Amino acid sequence: MADLEAVLADVSYLMAMEKSKATPAARASKRIVLPEPSIRSVMQKYLAERNEITFDKIFNQKIGFLLFKDFCLNEINEAVPQVKFYEEIKEYEKLDNEEDRLCRSRQIYDAYIMKELLSCSHPFSKQAVEHVQSHLSKKQVTSTLFQPYIEEICESLRGDIFQKFMESDKFTRFCQWKNVELNIHLTMNEFSVHRIIGRGGFGEVYGCRKADTGKMYAMKCLDKKRIKMKQGETLALNERIMLSLVSTGDCPFIVCMTYAFHTPDKLCFILDLMNGGDLHYHLSQHGVFSEKEMRFYATEIILGLEHMHNRFVVYRDLKPANILLDEHGHARISDLGLACDFSKKKPHASVGTHGYMAPEVLQKGTAYDSSADWFSLGCMLFKLLRGHSPFRQHKTKDKHEIDRMTLTVNVELPDTFSPELKSLLEGLLQRDVSKRLGCHGGGSQEVKEHSFFKGVDWQHVYLQKYPPPLIPPRGEVNAADAFDIGSFDEEDTKGIKLLDCDQELYKNFPLVISERWQQEVTETVYEAVNADTDKIEARKRAKNKQLGHEEDYALGKDCIMHGYMLKLGNPFLTQWQRRYFYLFPNRLEWRGEGESRQNLLTMEQILSVEETQIKDKKCILFRIKGGKQFVLQCESDPEFVQWKKELNETFKEAQRLLRRAPKFLNKPRSGTVELPKPSLCHRNSNGL
């Protein structure tokens, strides 16, 4: 029966994988719903205060670029050539073949440079033209050939064109998407969890599918009780910090994180899914690798280490078991549980796997940095070639003996190794850090320039254009059966109780990596969500011709901010009523959709503005003269933060002015005032 369950789990998992690759959006079981366009009023303030509304910030985000491009191509005629030119250059930069680059560069030159030069309409500098002409004439077509144009294109777009974008519906849509991104609160309900694919010291790894996009991920779940039992809180939190450091910027050679969240019992990391097994497994199945095969894995691992070291992260656990292959056979470094940030202080802890640890790591109290990873790389490459660590002779398991050999023995390299390979390993396995390859100040560049890698096109490596020596079998789960992986003994943690102070440790654990979420969305449901939202908004605009545009009331007035909030209403204060609010310097006004009355609360009636909680939801509480209360709730985190801030500041400023005002202004008034509905002018859907 267990065998049948394992087979069914494998089939379900493989089917989910195939469908996710083909049409991930079709696998989405939930829908992303964008907020109404009026969210712009709040989000524009929220983002501006965090310096997020600049040309560079928006243009360099995936969703921001797509919306800006859409605006330029459809609304601004003079921007069309620049945007198309920019996209052509970006496509050119991805080419890995010099012949292809030469052909494409000439096409770009003819279409976007020569054509405009002949018509005397070329808007770019003479230096940019001469740079490209000079390199093309010598057939020097590097991936950075058009870089001067990239800079000048961006400069031409960041002025009036960007300002017009900021006033457009496309910027409103950007605000809608950012509101969704900044209000992500993940739970297990957001994922369909498939079979177990691995297990570690604190928990298991599962294949899973994200419900609202259909994308497949690996979910690493750490058990909070097991962490507490083993006093592993620092390790667990450190892994989340290290993953957040290395998961920004494109690096195809690290198993990166897109989300982190926690439940009452688990810490969950949502990671890149790797289906090809690890190098330790393939070493046991395939046997030792040739120099050429090893070189392939070495180049990809070096770029992964380079990405970490550039962010001042030392990995500290490089070994074949931690190198995972994707379905095509390309390698990624996984499991950053022992990684460490050395930007402010160098580590000196003795951690890692015996047989791969550098001498300075074994010498307790000795500080080290990225130097340790280059030694470990030498150990790992030796194992791929010989089947064992250079310091683990005759399959010894005595850790003290392995450490003693690491600290004292000079590795003897077989005569079958090429001179270049011997030189590489001798350089990496130097016990003296000052003599070690990669530790002379040049870091990864020193290693990449070694003669063993002569002829390697590192851009080719980065773009994953070299054919992998080993392609994992398709249609198979390259992981042990669930029965073989096993499970934890629940009796171990039976007596462990999670207290409030334990949960408090994880209050800042949840995280969304913005660029990776945007990449996920744009690859899957972005176009469908935009199309659905356009239809909904068109219907609402048609309806609002009769009802009046709620946001229009703010136009031409001293309105600070406006938008929807939930008001605790009815005589018993038990129901939340959705209303449209307008904040002015001296009052807060609101009304329901289509209502003929406008309600009013003046600043002089308010005694205080406070934060409170109702059923675990953050709320804004107004204490009003006469012992009354007025409670508001927002529909997203950014809205709550911004409304709370603006209401507090407006209230304080009003109090300051009232203290200076003549006494007759302080005559008592009733709690709320009903105003006649003002006449509204029609407008577009920008939300202002």
UniProtKB/Swiss-Prot annotation:
<dbReference type="GO" id="GO:0002029">
    <property type="term" value="P:desensitization of G protein-coupled receptor signaling pathway"/>
</dbReference>
<dbReference type="InterPro" id="IPR008271">
    <property type="entry name" value="Ser/Thr_kinase_AS"/>
</dbReference>
<keyword id="KW-0832">Ubl conjugation</keyword>
<dbReference type="InterPro" id="IPR036305">
    <property type="entry name" value="RGS_sf"/>
</dbReference>
<dbReference type="GO" id="GO:0004672">
    <property type="term" value="F:protein kinase activity"/>
</dbReference>
<dbReference type="InterPro" id="IPR000961">
    <property type="entry name" value="AGC-kinase_C"/>
</dbReference>
<dbReference type="GO" id="GO:0007165">
    <property type="term" value="P:signal transduction"/>
</dbReference>
<feature type="region of interest" description="Disordered">
    <location>
        <begin position="669"/>
        <end position="688"/>
    </location>
</feature>
<dbReference type="InterPro" id="IPR000719">
    <property type="entry name" value="Prot_kinase_dom"/>
</dbReference>
<feature type="binding site">
    <location>
        <position position="220"/>
    </location>
    <ligand>
        <name>ATP</name>
    </ligand>
</feature>
<feature type="binding site">
    <location>
        <begin position="197"/>
        <end position="205"/>
    </location>
    <ligand>
        <name>ATP</name>
    </ligand>
</feature>
<keyword id="KW-0966">Cell projection</keyword>
<keyword id="KW-0723">Serine/threonine-protein kinase</keyword>
<keyword id="KW-0547">Nucleotide-binding</keyword>
<dbReference type="InterPro" id="IPR011993">
    <property type="entry name" value="PH-like_dom_sf"/>
</dbReference>
<dbReference type="GO" id="GO:0004703">
    <property type="term" value="F:G protein-coupled receptor kinase activity"/>
</dbReference>
<dbReference type="GO" id="GO:0005829">
    <property type="term" value="C:cytosol"/>
</dbReference>
<dbReference type="InterPro" id="IPR011009">
    <property type="entry name" value="Kinase-like_dom_sf"/>
</dbReference>
<dbReference type="GO" id="GO:0007186">
    <property type="term" value="P:G protein-coupled receptor signaling pathway"/>
</dbReference>
<comment type="subunit">
    <text>Interacts with GIT1.</text>
</comment>
<protein>
    <recommendedName>
        <fullName>G protein-coupled receptor kinase 3</fullName>
        <ecNumber>2.7.11.15</ecNumber>
    </recommendedName>
</protein>
<keyword id="KW-0067">ATP-binding</keyword>
<dbReference type="GO" id="GO:0005524">
    <property type="term" value="F:ATP binding"/>
</dbReference>
<dbReference type="GO" id="GO:0047696">
    <property type="term" value="F:beta-adrenergic receptor kinase activity"/>
</dbReference>
<feature type="domain" description="AGC-kinase C-terminal">
    <location>
        <begin position="454"/>
        <end position="521"/>
    </location>
</feature>
<comment type="function">
    <text>Specifically phosphorylates the agonist-occupied form of the beta-adrenergic and closely related receptors.</text>
</comment>
<dbReference type="InterPro" id="IPR000239">
    <property type="entry name" value="GPCR_kinase"/>
</dbReference>
<dbReference type="Pfam" id="PF00615">
    <property type="entry name" value="RGS"/>
</dbReference>
<dbReference type="InterPro" id="IPR017441">
    <property type="entry name" value="Protein_kinase_ATP_BS"/>
</dbReference>
<feature type="active site" description="Proton acceptor">
    <location>
        <position position="317"/>
    </location>
</feature>
<comment type="similarity">
    <text>Belongs to the protein kinase superfamily. AGC Ser/Thr protein kinase family. GPRK subfamily.</text>
</comment>
<dbReference type="GO" id="GO:0098794">
    <property type="term" value="C:postsynapse"/>
</dbReference>
<keyword id="KW-0418">Kinase</keyword>
<dbReference type="GO" id="GO:0001664">
    <property type="term" value="F:G protein-coupled receptor binding"/>
</dbReference>
<feature type="domain" description="RGS">
    <location>
        <begin position="54"/>
        <end position="175"/>
    </location>
</feature>
<dbReference type="InterPro" id="IPR044926">
    <property type="entry name" value="RGS_subdomain_2"/>
</dbReference>
<dbReference type="InterPro" id="IPR016137">
    <property type="entry name" value="RGS"/>
</dbReference>
<dbReference type="Pfam" id="PF00069">
    <property type="entry name" value="Pkinase"/>
</dbReference>
<feature type="region of interest" description="N-terminal">
    <location>
        <begin position="1"/>
        <end position="190"/>
    </location>
</feature>
<dbReference type="GO" id="GO:0042995">
    <property type="term" value="C:cell projection"/>
</dbReference>
<dbReference type="Pfam" id="PF00169">
    <property type="entry name" value="PH"/>
</dbReference>
<dbReference type="GO" id="GO:0005886">
    <property type="term" value="C:plasma membrane"/>
</dbReference>
